[in-house]
């Protein structure tokens, strides 16, 4: 089922919201009462423009329970500010219940910070040397190991348009073309 509503007229959003609610209710009912708790055929929702359509009121709870019933969602948003606007205090529940997160780039600060924090830190070797001139000249060499963010928020902001960063639960992040 593919639904298209005009992005310039929000008056049709309620129809999509009702459709989602009915589909989720029916799929859950079928899984729970007719299929032993799991649908025999996996169902995937591709929710493009996720932040711009009406969603079931309990979407966060649906997202956290759908996997056990052979249902999944692909959620497509522009940035995390959209999630924060929709879900206020519970927005972190959405990415927290997603096993895969693909960052394609963006221009919103809190998203840059979030991605930078997800990437974590790495270690770098730092070599420094110094020399003093004079009667009793001396020199020194120091080697240090320092922790550094893999990408600072600013480096995340400048991510090449041909690259993406992929986070898969249980694996190290991947940078891909």
Residue ranges and their predicted role:
Residues 3-141, 172:
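Conserved P-loop NTPase motor cores
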Residues 130, 136-177:
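Conserved P-loop NTPase motor module
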